[in-house]
Amino acid sequence: TANLMFDSWRRTGIFPEENSYYLPQEYDHITQCTLYYNDKELVEIVGQMPPDEKMVVFVKSRRDMERYRKFFGDEAAYFCSSNNAGGAMDPIEKCVNDCVLQKRILVTTVALYNGIDIEDPALKHIVIELWDPTDIRQAIGRKRPINKKDTCQLYFRSLPKQYITTTREKTEYWLEPGQARIKFEAGRESIWQEFLKKPTADDQIKEEVTLTYSPTTGSYTADKMAIALLRDKDQKLRKMEKLGYEKFMEEELWSSMGLTAKKVRFKKLEDYLENVQGQMMQKEELRAQIMEAGQIAPPTGRCKNRPLGQIVLNREIRQYGYEIKDRTDWGRNSPTRGKTFWVVTKLQ
C-alpha cells in the first residue's frame, strides 16, 4: 500500500525525491521456507511441531478460520476484524498480550497487521495462506526477533489455478464500476452509461469498493486509491495465472528475501518408504499407504474418480530419494507368478 502511495506522489511531484529514504528489510531470522498443498498437510505439520513452539497461521477469510477451528479447537486462538460479516472471534488480548502469543496456535486474517507486534521467541512457525506479496511481507513482519537466536520457519500454501482465476475475476468485478466512473469524470459519460446497463451494475455499485457516495450531492465519485490498489492486485493475479503460484512467488517474493521454497516432508512417509523398500506390493495397498503417510490429497475435478498413478506418486516421493517401479513376479513356485507389482526403490 505504501509503495503505491509513494509512487503516485512521485509522479505528481507531491513527494520530492530528496525526501525519499530506503530502509532495507532483513530476513536473516528465517531459517527455512516450505511449501504445502492442503489442510491435511498443515495438520500434520502442526503434529510434528515441538510442544514448546508456537505457530501463527495467516488465512484469507473468516471462513478459513472456521474451517481450521474444526481441526485445532481450543488449542488455537482466532482473530479477525470486528467489521467482518460474521463479527469478531477472540478478543486481541486473548490472542496476543504484551507482544506474546497466548496460545500455541493463532489463526488470523490480515486484521493482525494493524500495529500488532509479536516479540515471542517461542513463535517458530509462520504459515502463509495469502497470495499478495505486499500482504505477505506485512504478515511476516509481525514477528519481531529479540535477538539473533530468535528464528522461525515459513510455510506457504500453494494455490491452484482455479482459485487464482476466481480471485482475479472478483477483483475485476470490484474494479469495473470505479474505472467506468473515472472515465465519466473525465468527460466520457457514455462509458458510465454503458456500465449501468449491466445486470450486475446495481450490486457492484452498492458494494462501494471503488466508489464513494456523497449524501450531499447524491452521486458517486471514483475512489482513486482503491482503484490503484485493485489494479495492482489485478496485474499480480494475471501474472500468477500465467506463471503459476510457485513461479510467481519465486519471482515476486522469495528471491528478494533470499529464500528457496522446498516441498513439505513428513517423517512418517520417510520411515514408511525405508521400511517397504524392495518389497513387491499390490498397487492399491502401496498407493493407500503412501497417500496416508504423506497426507496426499485424492484427485479432484475431472480426475476425482481415478486413482493416483505411478507418475503422480513418484513426483511426491522423489524428494525422499525413492521412486516406484513395476516388477513382475517370476518366482517358479510363486502363487502370484506372472503378476505385476509395484516396488519402492532407492534413487541412484
Regions found by a protein language model. Give the residues of each.
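Interdomain hinge/linker at the junction between the two RecA-like core domains of SF2 helicases
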Residues: 2-48
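Conserved helicase motor
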Residues: 60-63, 77-92, 109-113
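Conserved two-lobed SF2 helicase motor
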Residues: 99-115
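Conserved SF2 helicase motif VI
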Residues: 129-154
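A short beta-strand element within the Helicase C-terminal
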Residues: 107, 116-130, 152-154
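Conserved strand-helix element at the start of the C-terminal RecA-like helicase core
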Residues: 45-72
